[in-house]
Amino acid sequence: MPGIVELPTLEELKVEEVKVSSAVLKAAAHHYGAQCDKTNKEFMLCRWEEKDPRRCLKEGKLVNGCALNFFRQIKSHCAEPFTEYWTCLDYSNMQLFRHCRQQQAKFDQCVLDKLGWVRPDLGQLSKVTKVKTDRPLPENPYHSRARPEPNPVIEGDLKPAKHGTRFFFWTV
C-alpha cells in the first residue's frame, strides 16, 4: 500500500559514531577527502538517485566505516603532529589555515612518510568525476510522473480576443 511507510529497525541504524570536533574535521578534510573519495561519492550518488535515505543505509555505513578507519590510522601513526595542527586551527581566529601552515607542513610530512598519502592539490577533490558503482539503476531515477496527454487540436478559426489582451498597459 502506498500509505504505509516502512522504517528501518534500530539494528539497521546502529553504527559507531565519528566523535570529533569541527577543528579536527577541518584539519583532516583534505586527506580524508582523498582517502574516502570513492565511498563518499558512491553514497552521494545513491542519495541523489534514490531520493530516499533509507535505501542508502549500506553506503552510509561504508562512509562511516571509512571515516573511522581513517582517523584510527591518523591516531596510530601521526597523532602528535595532527593534534598540534587541529589545536592550532581550533585556537586561531575562525579556524583559518593561514595561521597554522607550520603545523600543517609537519602533519603533511608525517602522513607522507608513514602512510604514503600525498595532500591533494587545491581543487583536485572538487573536480567532476564518474562513479563506478555495482548498484542497479533505479527504475525511475528522476522520480518523474508520466507525461500527460497533449491538448486536443482546436478545429476552426481562432478569433482575436473581444476586449484585447489581459496586459492592458501594453495595448494603450
UniProtKB/Swiss-Prot annotation:
GO biological process: aerobic respiration; mitochondrial electron transport, NADH to ubiquinone; proton motive force-driven mitochondrial ATP synthesis
InterPro entries named among the record's database cross-references: CHCH (IPR010625), NDUFA8 (IPR016680)
Domain of life: Eukaryota
Motif Cx9C motif 2 mapped to chain: 56-66
Quaternary structure (record): Complex I is composed of 45 different subunits.
This protein's domain notes: Contains four C-X9-C motifs that are predicted to form a helix-coil-helix structure, permitting the formation of intramolecular disulfide bonds.
Protein name (database record): NADH dehydrogenase [ubiquinone] 1 alpha subcomplex subunit 8
Gene designation per UniProt: Ndufa8
